[in-house]
């Protein structure tokens, strides 16, 4: 074997062997338990980043460890290939999104292969392939048949200059990202999926998942089950008696209503604006700005009084209706009751417009003033009703029950369960996505594309220009024949939300060549035993994929109702940031590789200069690696310099998988040094390590017994840590093993071979290349088979047995040293050894022992 460890040579040789034997191709078998571990598929943005490296290495380590333990394991990979970034890149570069996407896939796949990942590439999928998105279209039509998918009007961001719909992230401070025009809200017909139909099940089934509690709580909050009262404020308009309906979780405060507010799109607002230019102008103003919920929550709250009054259902008092820009038509009834004394948003609104405030809940020991909002004003748990007539003195629950009963008796309302969750709007007015399989016929209306005509293929040669959907301008795509009547018709030009693509790709990995959406192989592998991805996907992707599983189950497509038994959300990768700020306050960020840092005598950074000019830069602190902060580390540069195994070892050792990982150049160097030591020991002891001599464990020298005891003791812990996914302590265990082996002077060749073989197997899942090559070159393969399938080492329990044990020695309860005694020593023998120990003589100060306390296996305490 080579004298020096050359990562590029070692990794090239190992990967060549794996390719030649198709080492990671997996088939279904009943002979072994299966384990399906999946990393969230990447968007093909162009290059891998360190977050990818960490995620895929975690998956790879899991795969290799479980394969050694007898599992039929599968690690697939694919590409979340549709989406807006490809359109933006296409506009910037003047190339079709398809070319940009496929070029990126090719490069990123090459990067993954250089990492030595155990991916079964025969199962690769790309969501932009017609073979894949055909099944998006097929199941959409099935959902349409069952009423799970449906069409209704929805609100979107409209850029009046570019004449296009904008995604929420394309609206910046209320303006279009390209044109700078004020964005308008526009109502257009869109397709939705009834995820709300599954709200209860989505909420209840969280209990049975092995997912982080944080993710479960985020989903619980997003689903948002609320218990409240739905009721109406009566009014008369155009000679008709009507109700302005609202939903509230604080029906106890109904006697404190001083106004009602409706959304700009509410039918009542539309009616009241007739003949009222001032109201119409305000409604038009409300329709500017983004529709994202976060934008709505943070924007300035504005309103306009309509001069129209509804009737309070219990007091018969008149309540004025306002139009409010903060009221969403898509939430609840599109109207809210205003109780400024006990709702912080309402409080701020009335302070601005001079609307009265009426306190109806009092908290003992708290005073009430309209000068400023206090947290106690919204306290429902400790409040008692006042100024509420017959409800005075009631607490929250009692008050809600009584008020709901009275509203029901009047025929004006009742208790209701509502959800924060809204149906999933899947229509996107964009080009690069799955075409929605609908044909618009002037005679027949909206006609589903027949199953035999699927897929509706997306043309891949179009280049977006930012002025509307290219599909709407493509005659070849747009023009078609109605499948019902044969008349000339037009295709739907909206495409599906890319979350549709990512809701089920793990089914297709199992059966990538199936002539149906899934087959028996899908039920063999699914649900995933382990899913790995970032916490940022906790709500949308993970919730939609759970919904998808339940729908597919109910449609008889699959047998499972949850996509993943267990979820690991890996921590972010962090790095130092450096910048300079110009006079206008604009920051220019510099990559850490281009900066020299000075440290104080305690190793703390105290200054930094840019290598290019030697001038100072500001230390910006440690933040998530990102393009915006220019603090990323290119994995390819790292692999080219140190090798994939070093990159893998560092990312596994630096932090537990679920915690943040702070990048460290010194840590990378340390990982590289450790692998050189592992190689150097194998090279220096090649002759001894290749001998297959048996040994009698009972006749070993003390140093050999000590070495075996330490190796198997550490192995026990490493095995436990692998099972807990605590790979950082697995690496620590391997380091202890190497230290012990290097320090075992005089150990026989047979014992060195045994213990070094254990080390290689413990390290293999983390650093597969170097261990695979050492295993082959030192002859272990002939004895145990390829390291890919070598059995996980078993702990030799006899090696852990000790003829002597060490007990803590205490004098008057204080630790003064340790004594070594025979494992089966009697109490009398232990006392004798303790009393004869030099530490007893020193700390007893010549006083005789009054009592000796022996705690078997732990300590001996001499009382003087």
From Swiss-Prot:
It holds the Pfam family tRNA-synt_1g. One of its GO terms (cellular component) is cytosol. ATP binds at residue 627. It is found in: Cytoplasm. It catalyses: tRNA(Leu) + L-leucine + ATP = L-leucyl-tRNA(Leu) + AMP + diphosphate. Its EC number is 6.1.1.4. Keywords: Aminoacyl-tRNA synthetase, ATP-binding, Cytoplasm, Ligase, Nucleotide-binding, Protein biosynthesis. A motif ('KMSKS' region) lies at residues 624-628. Its main location: cytoplasm. The keyword Methyltransferase does not apply. A motif ('HIGH' region) lies at residues 42-52. The keyword Cell inner membrane does not apply. GO terms for molecular function: aminoacyl-tRNA deacylase activity; ATP binding; leucine-tRNA ligase activity. Gene3D superfamilies: 2.20.28.290, 3.10.20.590, HUPs, Isoleucyl-tRNA Synthetase, Domain 1, Valyl/Leucyl/Isoleucyl-tRNA synthetase, editing domain. One of its GO terms (biological process) is leucyl-tRNA aminoacylation. NCBIfam families: leuS_bact. Belongs to the class-I aminoacyl-tRNA synthetase family. This is Leucine--tRNA ligase. The gene is leuS.
């Amino acid at each position: 074997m080579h004298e020096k460890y050359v990562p590029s040579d070692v990794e090239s040789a190992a990967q060549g062997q794996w390719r030649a034997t198709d080492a990671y191709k997996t088939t279904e078998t009943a002979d072994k338990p299966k384990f399906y571990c999946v990393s969230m598929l990447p968007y093909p943005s162009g290059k891998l980043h360190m977050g990818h490296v960490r995620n895929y290495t975690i998956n790879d380590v899991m795969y290799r460890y479980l394969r050694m333990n007898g599992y039929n394991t599968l690690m697939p990979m694919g590409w979340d290939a549709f989406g807006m970034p490809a359109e933006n890149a296409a506009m910037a570069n003047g190339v079709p999104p398809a070319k940009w996407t496929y070029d990126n896939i090719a490069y990123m796949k090459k990067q993954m292969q250089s990492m030595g990942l155990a991916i079964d590439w025969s199962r690769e999928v790309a969501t932009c392939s017609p073979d894949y998105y055909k099944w998006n279209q097929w199941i959409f039509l099935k959902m349409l048949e069952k009423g799970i998918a449906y069409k209704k009007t929805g609100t979107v961001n409209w850029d009046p200059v570019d004449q296009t719909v904008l995604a929420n992230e394309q609206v910046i401070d209320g303006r279009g990202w390209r044109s700078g025009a004020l964005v308008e809200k526009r109502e257009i017909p869109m397709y939705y999926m009834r995820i709300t139909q599954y709200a209860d099940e989505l909420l209840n089934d969280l209990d049975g998942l092995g997912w982080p509690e944080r993710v479960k709580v985020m989903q619980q909050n997003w689903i948002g089950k609320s218990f409240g009262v739905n009721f109406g404020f009566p009014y008369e308009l155009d000679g008709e008696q009507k109700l302005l309906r609202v939903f509230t979780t604080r029906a106890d405060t109904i006697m404190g209503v001083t106004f009602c507010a409706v959304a700009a799109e509410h039918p009542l607002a539309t009616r009241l604006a007739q003949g009222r230019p001032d109201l119409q102008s305000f409604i038009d103003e409300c329709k500017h700005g983004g529709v994202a919920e976060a934008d709505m929550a943070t924007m300035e709250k504005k309103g306009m009084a309509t001069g129209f009054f509804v009737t309070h259902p219990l007091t018969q008092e008149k309540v004025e209706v306002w139009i409010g820009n903060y009221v969403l038509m898509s939430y609840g009834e599109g109207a809210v009751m205003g109780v400024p004394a006990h709702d912080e948003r309402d409080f701020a609104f009335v302070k601005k417009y001079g609307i009265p405030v009426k306190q109806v809940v009092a908290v003992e020991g708290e005073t009430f003033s309209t000068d400023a909002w206090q947290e106690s004003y919204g306290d429902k748990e400790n409040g008692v009703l006042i100024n509420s007539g017959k409800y005075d003195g009631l607490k929250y629950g009692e008050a809600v029950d009584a008020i709901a009963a009275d509203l029901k008796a009047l025929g004006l309302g009742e208790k209701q369960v509502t959800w924060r969750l809204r149906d999933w709007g899947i229509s996107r007015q964009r080009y690069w996505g799955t075409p929605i399989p609908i044909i618009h016929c002037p005679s027949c209306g909206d006609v589903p594309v027949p199953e035999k005509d699927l897929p509706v293929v997306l043309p891949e040669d179009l280049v977006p220009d930012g002025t509307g959907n290219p599909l709407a301008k493509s005659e070849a795509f747009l023009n078609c024949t109605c499948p019902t009547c044969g008349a000339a018709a037009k295709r739907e030009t909206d495409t599906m939300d890319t979350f549709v693509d990512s809701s089920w790709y793990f089914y297709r990995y199992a059966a990538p060549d199936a002539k149906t959406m899934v087959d028996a192989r899908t039920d063999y592998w699914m649900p995933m035993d382990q899913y790995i991805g970032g916490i940022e996907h906790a709500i949308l992707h993970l919730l939609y994929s759970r919904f998808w599983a339940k729908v597919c189950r109910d449609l008889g497509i699959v047998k499972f109702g949850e996509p993943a038994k267990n979820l690991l959300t890996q921590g972010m990768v962090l790095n130092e940031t450096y910048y300079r700020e110009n006079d206008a306050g604009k920051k220019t960020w510099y990559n850490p590789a281009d900066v020299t840092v000075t440290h104080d005598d305690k190793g703390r950074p105290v200054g930094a200069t840019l290598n290019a000019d030697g001038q100072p830069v500001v230390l910006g602190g440690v933040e998530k690696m990102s393009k915006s902060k220019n603090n990323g580390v290119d994995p390819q540069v790292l692999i080219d310099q140190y090798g994939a195994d070093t990159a893998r070892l560092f990312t596994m050792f630096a932090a537990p998988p679920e915690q943040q990982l702070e990048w460290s150049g010194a840590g990378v160097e340390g990982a590289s040094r450790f692998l050189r030591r592992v190689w150097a020991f194998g090279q220096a002891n090649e002759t001894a390590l290749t001998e297959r001599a048996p040994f009698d464990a009972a006749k070993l020298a003390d140093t050999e017994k000590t070495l075996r005891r330490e190796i198997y003791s550490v192995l026990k812990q490493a095995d436990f840590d692998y099972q807990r996914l605590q790979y950082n302590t697995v690496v620590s265990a391997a380091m202890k093993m190497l230290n012990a082996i290097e320090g075992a002077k005089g150990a026989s060749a047979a014992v060195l071979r045994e213990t070094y073989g254990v080390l290689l197997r413990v390290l293999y899942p983390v650093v597969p290349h170097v261990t695979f090559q050492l295993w082959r070159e030192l002859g272990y393969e002939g004895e145990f088979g390829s390291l890919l399938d070598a059995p996980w080492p078993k702990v030799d329990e006899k090696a852990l047995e000790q003829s002597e044990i060490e007990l803590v020695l205490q004098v008057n309860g204080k630790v003064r040293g340790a004594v070594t005694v025979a494992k089966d020593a009697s109490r009398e023998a232990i006392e004798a050894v303790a009393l004869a120990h030099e530490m007893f003589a020193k700390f007893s100060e010549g006083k005789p022992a009054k009592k000796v306390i022996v705690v078997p296996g732990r300590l001996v305490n001499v009382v003087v």
